[in-house]
């Protein structure tokens, strides 16, 4: 993206006022803001790095934020946001869960709160298109998530989950998936989700294992055969699936 711009602090209070008007739960502190012209879009945007932003007492580690607005609004010292692009780094899932507790009840919310006990968004970028009332029209996101522990059931805990993701309104691409369950290691995997008339999901996982007597006893606690015999198996498996 080719840009030109100037640096100022004149819009700080205006931006903070607009943010708090939309949601008073935000606490925002800004350093100097750069007004830039995106030559590709012929559109102005306001840019700042490492702003101090808290929501419901949770610090959101935003590294950069860009707010696109109409040229005539800027000239009149007003802001009408139509696009927001921001990046985050090192955002712990505990902080994300605290924010999620404030949203409306849902099965997805309950699952995130009860089944994930660790993890981190290493880095992610979000591109949000909004209307003049700040209602979300379109979005894109990409990033890297790591060190997630996911509780599937009381006896099934998948650890050290990591993956890259790309998401928009029509697709979700998850790749470079790695994870471990006891002594079974998922070394690479991918999931593609396409939203058409119906959801279409395709995926594949490669798992590696080297199971000895102790590992079999952990995996098959109720099967006497593995307790009574010494067994060792090693190898790899490729799993592919498709859902429509």
Question: What residue spans do the PLM features occupy?
Answer:
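Extracytoplasmic/ectodomain regions of membrane proteins and secreted proteins
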Residues: 132-137
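Terminal hydrophobic membrane-targeting helix
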Residues: 2-95, 113-121, 125-131, 172, ...
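Small-residue helix/turn framework positions
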Residues: 43-52, 80-125, 138-149, 157-158, ...
């Amino acid at each position: 993206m080719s840009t030109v711009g100037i640096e100022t602090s004149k819009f700080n209070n205006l931006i903070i006022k607009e943010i708090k008007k939309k949601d008073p739960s935000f606490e925002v502190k800004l350093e100097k803001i750069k007004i830039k012209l995106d030559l590709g879009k012929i559109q102005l945007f306001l840019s700042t790095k490492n702003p101090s932003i808290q929501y419901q007492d949770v610090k959101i580690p935003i590294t950069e934020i860009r707010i696109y607005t109409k040229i005539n609004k800027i000239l009149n010292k007003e802001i009408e946001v139509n696009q927001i692009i921001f990046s985050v780094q090192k955002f712990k899932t505990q902080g994300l869960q605290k924010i999620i507790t404030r949203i409306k009840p849902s099965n997805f919310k309950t699952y995130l709160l009860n089944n994930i006990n660790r993890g981190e968004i290493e880095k992610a970028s979000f591109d949000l298109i909004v209307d003049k009332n700040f209602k979300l029209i379109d979005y894109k996101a990409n990033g890297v998530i790591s060190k997630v522990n996911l509780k599937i059931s009381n006896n099934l805990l998948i650890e050290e989950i990591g993956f890259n993701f790309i998401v928009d309104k029509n697709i979700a691409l998850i790749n470079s998936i790695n994870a471990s369950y006891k002594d079974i290691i998922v070394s690479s995997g991918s999931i593609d989700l396409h939203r058409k008339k119906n959801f279409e999901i395709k995926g594949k996982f490669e798992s590696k294992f080297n199971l000895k007597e102790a590992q079999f006893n952990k995996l098959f606690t109720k099967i006497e055969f593995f307790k009574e015999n010494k067994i060792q198996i090693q190898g790899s498996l490729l799993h592919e699936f498709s859902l429509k």
